[in-house]
Amino acid sequence: MTHEPLTASVGIVTPQHVRLFGASTPLQLDGGTLLHSVDVSYETYGTLNQERSNAVLICHALSGNAHAAGYHSKDDKRPGWWDHYIGPGKPFDTNRYFVIASNNLGGCDGTTGPSSIDPATGMPYGLNFPMITIGDIVRVQHALVRQLGIERLMAVVGGSMGGMQALQWALDYPHMVPASVIIAAAPRLTAQNIAFNAVARQAIMADPHFNGGDYYTLPGDPTTKARPESGLALARMMAHITYLSEQGLHERFGRRLQDRDALSYGFETDFAVESYLSYQGSSFVKRFDANSYLYITKAMDYFDPFPDAETTVQRLTGVESHFLVMSFDTDWRFDTSRSKELVRILHRSLKDCTFQEFSSPAGHDAFLLPHPSYEKSLGSFLLRTWQSITGGQA
């Protein structure tokens, strides 16, 4: 398979793994429980400079992973999920920056989560995995960054749930984060967003194969347990609708029929948009764990760093970040008003914050897709940050 020229790509990348924390230094979770070890999957792109001052941490969204750019092999059909933005000459210019991406705590792509083996039992955690928060996820990222020998990041960047993490970083480690980029996110979920997550979780737990979260088949087990694929697919289909815009759906599908010239007058898949959503659901269950979906959506529900005025003042005191907050005009899952809410909070505390809204028919998913104006703004902000820290010239 032919990929884009290596001058525009980070090329072939190798996933890396590290075990953090330990029996004497466990991870203290916000819920009060402990994890005595956490495995983390991560990837890096570019080179860490001698001063260790050019590191940029990228935080992924709900269903993302550590594979943000490049290819794992020459046979890969697709690059990492943000490949358009990471590489030589791109906004995350790997000729200048050392870019880090890791799989989140609670995930299912190499980092400890519900599908991992519980050392205490030798069995997958399942629903015995402790509840986690965005703060817990960031705590693990912080441990990874320190493990890499980095005392201060150049910037933390994230979209959607990744934007929540970028904000949490600025609050929890104010002296480590001179720049924060928060894209298509919000300072807390609305009741509507919590409702979307609740229905998705119910779809998973109502699947007859959910079995209280115990559906894993261990290596060497002669019996194969059925997984709650129907419930997870339904959760994904519903969520995916919220990631798109009405305009985008209309332009792409309208009322076009799928593989037919006339209505079936039955419950077959008549419309192209039905087929598209079915594909999204069926492909998602091949790469994602249902229990991880439960835990991560709960972490998003719990996120609320500014519950009242007094807490807001306390949390923002000492924060050193320069903020860039970005939104898209057709994103109704995290609409522009939510980004502006965050901007108002930051401005009231006299924090340096720039806000930009971009026009796109792609809805919430626009932050993942090519967009010249968005790309230019993101790249310019990172370049200015790099120049201010390193004294480098463009």
Curated annotation (Swiss-Prot):
Its main location: cytoplasm. The active site is at S160 (nucleophile), D331, H364. This is Homoserine O-succinyltransferase. GO terms for molecular function: homoserine O-acetyltransferase activity; homoserine O-succinyltransferase activity. The record marks R333 as: Important for acyl-CoA specificity. Its EC number is 2.3.1.46. It is found in: Cytoplasm. Transmembrane segments: none annotated. The keyword Acyltransferase applies. Homodimer. One of its GO terms (cellular component) is cytoplasm. The keyword Cytoplasm applies. It catalyses: L-homoserine + succinyl-CoA = O-succinyl-L-homoserine + CoA. Keywords: Acyltransferase, Amino-acid biosynthesis, Cytoplasm, Methionine biosynthesis, Transferase. Pathway: Amino-acid biosynthesis; L-methionine biosynthesis via de novo pathway; O-succinyl-L-homoserine from L-homoserine: step 1/1. Substrate binds at R236, D365. The lineage of its organism: Bacteria, Pseudomonadati, Pseudomonadota, Alphaproteobacteria, Magnetococcales. InterPro entries: AB_hydrolase_1, AB_hydrolase_fold, HAT_MetX-like. Gene3D superfamilies: 1.10.1740.110, alpha/beta hydrolase. PANTHER family: HOMOSERINE O-ACETYLTRANSFERASE. Transfers a succinyl group from succinyl-CoA to L-homoserine, forming succinyl-L-homoserine. Residues 54-368 form the AB hydrolase-1 domain. It comes from Magnetococcus marinus (strain ATCC BAA-1437 / JCM 17883 / MC-1). Belongs to the AB hydrolase superfamily. MetX family. One of its GO terms (biological process) is homoserine metabolic process.
